[in-house]
């Protein structure tokens, strides 16, 4: 689609992706980390470049598509480079499952955990990812966030929260989400209604503006639920 023009900060953005890389993905300097995403996408910015490199880890970058010349390519790369943390999107997991459901068994690699990002992952796809790709051992870190947020907002955390197929888990530390309906009424747990996810507090990774269009930035992201347009207090 058309680029949004999200303008991120420098220090705050780096601090947030470094923090989530360390505390959510548990990346350490000795790890070989592979985020199998497009480097031109926010996931590539945050979790191919800035996050793992800020942790002094080795970050794998590859060219081409995962299933060419054959669907065993990702697992060969993982085996050859001793990748121990894997990160990809449900769309890619579905593609790999369809193209070569038994391919992971052919290769000797070991992931301690695997991240999923970008969209919901169906429980049956999640189970294949865990059983076949993760060999029944790797923890799945199921995340929710978007371009505007800079890094993870919700996620299961390795060893701290139980995995649930198809669920991205609770808010990460420092993030306080709430669900509002169209009239700014809060929808509590069990409300049985759809609403809009809002974050009640600022955080270092949140984007600063839309490039060249601050009015659209305010109208799109803040005006709907703003209690006092003249206030300078973020709580309003």
Positions of the model-derived regions?
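Gly/Ser/Thr-rich phosphate-binding loop
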Residues: 50, 57, 84-88, 97-165, ...
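Conserved beta-loop-beta connector loops within the AMP-binding
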Residues: 178-201, 206
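Active-site glycine/GP-rich loop and adjacent strand/helix microenvironment
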Residues: 117, 154-156, 169, 189-192, ...
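Active-site glycine-centered loops adjacent to acidic/histidine catalytic or metal-binding residues
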Residues: 1, 38, 118, 145, ...
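Conserved ATP-binding/catalytic segment of the ANL
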Residues: 198-236
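Short Gly/Pro-enriched turn/cap motifs at secondary-structure boundaries
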Residues: 162-171, 188, 224-236
């Amino acid at each position: 689609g058309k680029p949004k023009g999200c303008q991120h900060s420098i220090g705050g953005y780096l601090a947030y992706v470094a923090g989530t890389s360390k505390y959510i993905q548990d990346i350490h300097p000795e790890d070989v980390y592979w985020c199998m995403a497009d480097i031109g996408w926010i996931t590539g910015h945050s979790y191919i470049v800035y996050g793992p490199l800020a942790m002094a880890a080795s970050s794998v970058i590859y060219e081409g598509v995962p299933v060419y010349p054959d669907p065993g390519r990702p697992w060969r790369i993982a085996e050859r480079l001793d990748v121990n943390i894997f990160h990809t999107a449900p769309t890619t997991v579905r593609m790999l499952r369809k193209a070569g459901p038994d391919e992971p068994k052919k290769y000797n690699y070991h992931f301690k955990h695997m991240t999923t990002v970008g969209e919901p992952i169906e429980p049956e796809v999640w189970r294949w990812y865990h059983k076949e790709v993760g060999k029944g051992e790797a923890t799945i870190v199921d995340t929710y966030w978007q371009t505007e947020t800079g890094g993870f907002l919700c996620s299961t955390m390795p060893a701290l929260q139980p995995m649930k197929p198809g669920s991205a888990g609770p808010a990460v530390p420092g993030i306080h989400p709430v669900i509002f309906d169209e009239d700014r009424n809060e929808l509590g747990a069990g409300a049985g209604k759809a609403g809009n996810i809002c974050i009640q507090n600022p955080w270092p990774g949140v984007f600063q503006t839309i490039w060249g269009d601050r009015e659209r930035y305010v109208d799109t992201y803040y005006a709907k639920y703003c209690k006092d347009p003249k206030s300078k207090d973020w709580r309003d």
